């Protein structure tokens, strides 16, 4: 999955062990060596290091090494998002990216001095995020003047997803004021949504009754983050089909609105959302049904899901809210 490049090598290995542990709670060293290119001793030391963190953070997962492999043990209160958050906080690569997004004018020299890391090392770490850049249709500027190149709306969407990663307890009420502030800050620094970009966004979501310029983007944030209750007329067929489906009778109108907001993100932006990234151990049958209804009732559904390979994960998340 695309976000794994944000982790350092050790943390990425632990995440892979966790993912393998979802299929079988015991993983042999042979399998881990093929997957992670680490020796058995290195994997054992990683497990011991994680035990120290787990004793303090209580995230609900432990990796217990033995002579032949690793046993993955989960407690009842285990949360995948909390594990990811703990691993992410250890990552210098993530810190560098976050700083660059928060302050687009910061230079590689300033980052080098602040973190006591060579300039080339910082550049290599940012280059190592190539899967992320490609997924969000962004790229690095070779001379590091602007560093991250691409549509401003895409950069803000990436910021939104990375901010969600830093809220493992899902306190999403802080997202709207944060995104409004960072959007205004970036605009004041000259990183604005251009007239051409506004036209591109409107062509992707023509049902929106406002222009997606800087002012319109503020209103879009309110919609995406649940402050504006609005369902376009083109979703009437979807709404009727959803409410008539016996398996979905227990869900309210608010759920339909949440689904539209999710669809709107898929329409407007490239890149996996955090809801798409986390894969539930067992998919709700209702989520799979919802995908089928969307394919039939949502206009141009195939077009805006073409670049999103894990849409059902998002449906699962929305239905469990």
Predicted segment positions?
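A cross-family "folded-core" feature that marks the main globular domain of proteins
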Residues: 1-321
């Amino acid at each position: 999955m695309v976000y794994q490049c944000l982790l350092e090598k050790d943390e990425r290995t632990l995440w892979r062990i966790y993912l393998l542990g979802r299929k079988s709670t015991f993983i042999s060293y042979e399998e881990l060596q093929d997957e992670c290119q680490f020796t058995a001793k290195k994997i054992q030391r990683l497990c011991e290091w994680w035990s120290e963190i787990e004793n303090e953070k209580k995230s609900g997962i432990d990796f217990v090494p033995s002579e032949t492999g690793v046993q993955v043990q989960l407690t009842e209160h285990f949360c995948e998002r909390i594990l990811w958050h703990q691993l992410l906080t250890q990552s210098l690569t993530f810190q560098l990216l976050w700083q660059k997004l928060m302050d687009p004018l910061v230079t590689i020299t300033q980052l080098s001095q602040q973190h006591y890391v060579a300039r080339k090392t910082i550049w290599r770490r940012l280059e190592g995020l190539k899967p992320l850049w490609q997924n969000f249709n962004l790229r690095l500027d070779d001379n590091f003047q602007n560093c991250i190149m691409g549509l401003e709306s895409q950069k803000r969407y990436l910021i939104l997803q990375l901010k969600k990663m830093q809220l493992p307890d899902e306190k999403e009420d802080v997202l709207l004021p944060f995104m409004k502030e960072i959007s205004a800050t970036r605009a004041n620094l000259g990183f604005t949504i251009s007239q051409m970009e506004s036209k591109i966004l409107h062509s992707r979501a023509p049902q929106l009754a406002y222009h997606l310029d800087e002012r319109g983007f503020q209103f879009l944030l309110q919609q995406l983050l649940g402050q504006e209750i609005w369902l376009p007329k083109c979703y009437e067929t979807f709404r009727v089909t959803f409410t008539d489906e016996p398996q979905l009778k227990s869900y309210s109108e608010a759920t339909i609105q949440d689904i539209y907001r999710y669809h709107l993100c898929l329409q407007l932006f490239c890149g996996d959302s955090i809801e798409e990234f986390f894969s539930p151990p067992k998919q709700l049958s209702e989520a799979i049904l919802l995908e089928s209804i969307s394919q039939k009732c949502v206009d141009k559904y195939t077009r805006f899901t073409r670049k999103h390979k894990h849409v059902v994960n998002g449906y699962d998340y929305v239905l469990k809210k």
